[in-house]
Amino acid sequence: MAEPDYIEDDNPELIRPQKLINPVKTSRNHQDLHRELLMNQKRGLAPQNKPELQKVMEKRRRDQVIKQKEEEAQKKKSDLEIELLKRQQKLEQLELEKQKLQEEQENAPEFVKVKGNLRRTGQEVAQAQES
């Protein structure tokens, strides 16, 4: 390889170029990181660069396994647990029906409420006369 001209000339007025310092090589943190990446690469622990589709498929498989385990756990419920769940559902249904009736009564027009009151008072008067 040809040597540059400024090496042969010993002219003190010339500014001689100096080799640039590589900041990557001088940085201790970067050297440690590079060494760690090389070691992981040799061991096969390199960061996984999986395509997005593969990641989604793995996530779906994990979700599917979790769902299957939950279903198996539900299938293995004892008779007592099943009976308790049935009773709880019945109570919830009764409570919902009760709330619906209350809402219907509250939302009913005024004349329907008055008519119901008149019937009750009429029945009470009839019962009082019979006794």
UniProtKB/Swiss-Prot annotation:
Residues 52-78 have a biased composition (Basic and acidic residues). Keywords: Acetylation, Coiled coil. Signal peptide: none annotated. Residues 61-112 form a coiled coil. Disulfide bonds: none annotated. Residues 39-78, 100-131 are annotated as: Disordered. Pfam families: DUF1151 (PF06625). The modification N-acetylalanine is found at A2. The modification N6-acetyllysine is found at K50. GO terms for biological process: sensory perception of sound. Belongs to the FAM107 family. This is Protein FAM107B. It comes from Rattus norvegicus (Rat).
